[in-house]
Amino acid sequence: KEICFPRLGCFSDDAPWAGIAQRPL
């Protein structure tokens, strides 16, 4: 599964940073 952001692009949700997906940058 991947998470996509308009400004950041797409990333795997198993990446180390996945925890920030639930927070604004």
Swiss-Prot record:
Q: Provide the catalytic activity annotation.
A: a triacylglycerol + H2O = a diacylglycerol + a fatty acid + H(+); 1,2,3-tributanoylglycerol + H2O = dibutanoylglycerol + butanoate + H(+); 1,2,3-tri-(9Z-octadecenoyl)-glycerol + H2O = di-(9Z)-octadecenoylglycerol + (9Z)-octadecenoate + H(+); all-trans-retinyl hexadecanoate + H2O = all-trans-retinol + hexadecanoate + H(+)
One Gene Ontology molecular-function label: all-trans-retinyl-palmitate hydrolase, all-trans-retinol forming activity
The answer to keyword RNA-binding applying to this record is no
Cite the entry's keywords alphabetically.
Disulfide bond, Hydrolase, Lipid degradation, Lipid metabolism, Secreted
Disulfide feature = C4-C10
Tell me which EC number(s) this protein carries.
3.1.1.3
* Presence of the UniProt keyword Secreted in the record: yes
Record GO biological process: lipid catabolic process
Q: In terms of domain of life, where is this protein from?
A: Eukaryota
Could you tell me where this protein is found in the cell?
Secreted
The known regulators of its activity are described as:
Inhibited by bile salts, is reactivated by (pro)colipase/CLPS.
Top enzyme class of this protein? hydrolase
Cellular component terms (Gene Ontology): extracellular region
| Protein family (similarity comment) | Belongs to the AB hydrolase superfamily. Lipase family.
Q: How does it assemble?
A: Forms a 1:1 stoichiometric complex with (pro)colipase/CLPS.
Q: Name the job this protein performs.
A: Plays an important role in fat metabolism. It preferentially splits the esters of long-chain fatty acids at positions 1 and 3, producing mainly 2-monoacylglycerol and free fatty acids, and shows considerably higher activity against insoluble emulsified substrates than against soluble ones.
Q: What is this protein called?
A: Pancreatic triacylglycerol lipase
- The organism is Felis catus (Cat)
Q: Identify the taxonomic lineage of the organism of origin.
A: Eukaryota, Metazoa, Chordata, Craniata, Vertebrata
Q: Which gene name belongs to this protein? A: PNLIP
